[in-house]
């Protein structure tokens, strides 16, 4: 059963975990148990794991999500989203590509670390993920494919593959004044 809930910011401890915190009463109405996967639809649909909100956040028809989940749902704080329980499967494999064209593909040595960071995360094709490597800035990747299709949960057994970003001709040849040194007095 689909419900409309108002988007709120996630707790700091929930950032990057793919959680959607909701009032226990709202979860009961949707027949959602903690740990279930829910489909969240703003201007786009994404998936997250249902987690119970503390009593202080109850009775307000809120869904607490981190910035990445809000971006994937294309919904801002205080906007209404549709939420419903969806079936999910363990991901056999996930194909990711870097969001930035100049960002390389991780090495084979980095993939086990990435799998560990993404373990337990629900994803669907088209989602963007933030992966923070040790001591480095977060890197953004797009989910280009999943096996099976639909809502999947990344596990320790999920094969994670990367493909290089495709650079469009338009993007490859866009040059700015800064690229050529700007305009100085000659």
Where are these regions (language model features)?
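N-terminal pre-P-loop "Q-motif" helix
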Residues: 178-186
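Beta-strand/loop-dominated core regions that host nucleotide or nucleotide-derived cofactor-binding catalytic loops
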Residues: 1-176
């Amino acid at each position: 059963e689909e419900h409309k809930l108002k988007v709120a910011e996630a707790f700091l401890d929930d950032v990057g975990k793919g959680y959607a915190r909701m009032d226990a009463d709202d979860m009961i109405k949707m027949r959602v148990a903690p740990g279930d996967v829910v489909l969240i639809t703003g201007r786009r649909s994404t998936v997250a794991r249902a987690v119970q909100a503390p009593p202080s956040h109850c009775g307000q028809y809120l869904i607490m999500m981190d910035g990445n989940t809000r971006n994937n749902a294309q919904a801002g704080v205080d906007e209404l989203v549709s939420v419903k329980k969806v079936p999910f499967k363990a991901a056999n494999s996930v194909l990711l590509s870097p969001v930035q064209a100049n960002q390389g593909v991780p090495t084979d040595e980095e993939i086990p670390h990435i799998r560990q960071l993404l373990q337990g995360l629900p994803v669907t094709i088209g989602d963007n993920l933030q992966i923070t490597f040790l001591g480095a800035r977060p890197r953004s990747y797009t989910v280009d494919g999943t096996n099976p299709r639909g809502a999947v949960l990344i596990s320790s057994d999920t094969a994670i593959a990367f493909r290089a970003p495709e650079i469009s001709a338009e993007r490859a040849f866009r040059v700015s004044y800064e690229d050529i040194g700007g305009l100085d007095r000659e």
